[in-house]
Amino acid sequence: MGILEKVQPIEVMLPERYQTMSILEMEERVREIKEKMGALLFIPGHHYQKDEVVQFSDAAGDSLQLAQVAANNKEAKYIVFCGVHFMAETADMLTTDDQIVILPDMRAGCSMADMADIEQTERAWKELAKLFGDTMIPLTYVNSTAAIKAFCGRNGGATVTSSNAKQMVSWAFTQKERLVFLPDQHLGRNTAYDLGIPLEKMAVWNPHTDSLEYDGDIEEIQVILWKGHCSVHQNFTVKNIENVRKNHPDMNIIVHPECCYEVVAASDYAGSTKYIIDMIEAAPAGSKWAIGTEMNLVNRIIQQHPDKEIISLNPFMCPCLTMNRIDLPHLLWALENIERGEQINVIRVEKQVTEEAVLALNRMLERV
């Protein structure tokens, strides 16, 4: 079942009046509603959100940080999640039944999460079992649908974040001989390589051809990577790095591990969103940085650190387009509906899916 089938009710079109309101009018109304509702309303905002949204966030962070913060908030009745659908799903699964999770715009999806649907994954697992038998354990990046998390949960696997991927991959190899990593091949490849697994012992499962792509000996394969990627981080290239090295030879290059292996290998540093933020925060004044991650976050880091020279690794970088569907008009629309005693775009994950997905989430949370 897809995300849109799980949500009641669904409204896609923003009412016209929100498109004609001034920014100042909308900002004033959001403040009024936040003040009126107090602790009953909680607004988590992802690092990749626009400033117009982040300014109203009660907490900012990466996807799992925000879901955990939401889960720890027992006062809020309404959690208006300013992120994308898989994040809102995770928040719904980790919060109580009487808490209502709302996504301001149902079109705010994630192309990478959508690259692994449950039918493809079940089919792949059966085919891979013919090759490798009961020697595999699945791990999924938290940037995945609730259904994929549930698949991992019922098959003994777990979720991972970019911050704890090494720890979780290491754990996986204490459970089984082989790892199936969904849905981001780059995070899986970079993590496994950092742990000493050579590239020739990694294969890629292509869900479009239902085939395993590999160069080495099939018996030696330890990591099976799902053929998925982040559309934002895929756009950072080795050529970008070469240009920075040529034009700014004293500049540090730091990238997210969702970038491809070649880019990560050519960079000075690679790590999660939090790692990047903390690294720049701790860097001395006057230091120079080229950052390979989402544009809204890079621009915010630039604004927060005027004492440092910071640029985007790719000067023609675009923001995460689906994340950017959450904007001030949609946020206000969601809040005004709550104010009227109505809810739009409520995220509800089925009970069985929740139970199995929480197994995968808890296997991670109890180890990190």
From Swiss-Prot:
Coiled coil in keyword set: no
Enzyme kind, highest EC tier: transferase
Record Gene3D superfamilies: NadA-like
Main location: cytoplasm
Claim: Iron-sulfur is one of the keywords in the record: yes
Binding note for cofactor: Binds 1 [4Fe-4S] cluster per subunit.
Residue numbers binding [4Fe-4S] cluster: C110, C230, C320
A GO term for molecular function: quinolinate synthetase A activity
Subcellular location: Cytoplasm
One GO CC term on file: cytosol
Reactions catalysed, as given in the entry: iminosuccinate + dihydroxyacetone phosphate = quinolinate + phosphate + 2 H2O + H(+)
GO biological process annotation, one example: 'de novo' NAD biosynthetic process from L-aspartate
UniProt xrefs under InterPro entries: NadA, NadA_sf, Quinolinate_synth_A_type3
EC numbers, comma separated: 2.5.1.72
Pathway annotation: Cofactor biosynthesis; NAD(+) biosynthesis; quinolinate from iminoaspartate: step 1/1
Cofactor(s) required for function per UniProt: [4Fe-4S] cluster
Pfam families: NadA
Binding site for iminosuccinate: H46, S63, Y141, V142, N143, S162, H256, P257, E258, T273
UniProt keyword terms in alphabetical order: 4Fe-4S, Cytoplasm, Iron, Iron-sulfur, Metal-binding, Pyridine nucleotide biosynthesis, Transferase
Stored HAMAP family: NadA_type3 (MF_00569)
Function: Catalyzes the condensation of iminoaspartate with dihydroxyacetone phosphate to form quinolinate.
Similarity annotation: Belongs to the quinolinate synthase family. Type 3 subfamily.
Official protein name in the record: Quinolinate synthase
Gene name in the database record: nadA
